[in-house]
Amino acid sequence: MHSRIFQISKMWIGKENYLNEDTLHQGDGSFYDYCAEIDDEERKEDIRYFVNTALPKDMFELVGDDTMRYIGGVEQWKENFVTNIRKKAEAITTENMLEFVGPVYQLEKALENPLDIAYHFYLDGEGYQSFAEKSFAFMEFVCTLEPGTILYIGGV
């Protein structure tokens, strides 16, 4: 379960291109039925929390109601990510590899959602993508950014 899906792009996103419940598929041929419009104040509050609390500390700053700036820091984040993945992989043994919610599952979670957040990401400003992605895809996107890059938040 994820509480929000954030549409993020390097291009400004017009309201006509905001994601909505009809934009996204869950991957099993069905739509995200809980993805519904929220009012402007709730959207602003969700964006503030997302940028100031959910994303890696000191890597982003909110510069407008729907605009954030990438400050930098992805190299340190990558070092921490690799260290965490190695630690989780080393915890896997032949005895515990099949445990329910065991170390294999924990490794899988860390690979797919390294930010360990309940958000998914829609990384398309024009509305062509039909699926939301977990935080690893967002961090792959961040790895392509230069410090100072402005990112626009569309639908939430």
Residue ranges and their predicted role:
Residues 1, 116-156:
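Acidic, proline/glycine-rich low-complexity IDRs
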Residues 1-34, 147-156:
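Short, extreme N-terminal segment that most often corresponds to the first beta-strand
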Residues 12-17, 43-44, 128-132:
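Short, surface-exposed beta-strand/loop "edge" segments at domain boundaries and coil↔beta transitions
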Residues 15, 19-20, 46-47, 51, ...:
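Generic structural signal of hydrophobic/aromatic residues within well-ordered alpha-helices
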Residues 26-124:
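Low-complexity, serine/threonine/proline-enriched polar segments
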